[in-house]
Amino acid sequence: MKTFSAKGHEVQRDWFVIDATDKVLGRVASEVALRLRGKHKPEFTPHVDTGDFIVVINAGKLRVTGTKATEKTYYRHSGYPGGIYETNFLKMQQRFPGRALEKAVKGMLPKGPLGYAMIKKLKVYAEATHPHAAQQPKALEL
């Protein structure tokens, strides 16, 4: 018997919506990364993007445990000498709600072209409204 290998054009992709209100950042990110990758499906193939589309709403209401709200730091660099910028979780959530979740999920996905294709299927919104109602996303409880 031959081992099944999924083909990219034959994969059935579903849409899911996750409400992140008062959920812990890492727990939401790990479940989102698992579903973006397609590891929850029996036809999972490591070198093929078999994942689903994920819409995360209320990302501005995510929380972290302990003292990570003030101590977890995010870095970015302008490309110029001495051009490193540093911020914490609270400031990041106030300025760009949802970016902390995007960075957490991106770190859990594979690096390279396959990971870049997977992260494009993640849609994060700070509020409860989203423009993907036409896709009829199913609610996903965590």
From Swiss-Prot:
One of its GO terms (molecular function) is mRNA binding. The keyword Isomerase does not apply. SUPFAM superfamilies: Ribosomal protein L13 (SSF52161). GO terms for biological process: negative regulation of translation; translation. GO terms for cellular component: cytosolic large ribosomal subunit. Keywords: Ribonucleoprotein, Ribosomal protein. The keyword Transferase does not apply. InterPro entries: Ribosomal_uL13, Ribosomal_uL13_bac-type, Ribosomal_uL13_sf. Pfam families: Ribosomal_L13. Belongs to the universal ribosomal protein uL13 family. Part of the 50S ribosomal subunit. HAMAP family: Ribosomal_uL13. This protein is one of the early assembly proteins of the 50S ribosomal subunit, although it is not seen to bind rRNA by itself. It is important during the early stages of 50S assembly. This is Large ribosomal subunit protein uL13. It comes from Janthinobacterium sp. (strain Marseille) (Minibacterium massiliensis). The lineage of its organism: Bacteria, Pseudomonadati, Pseudomonadota, Betaproteobacteria, Burkholderiales.
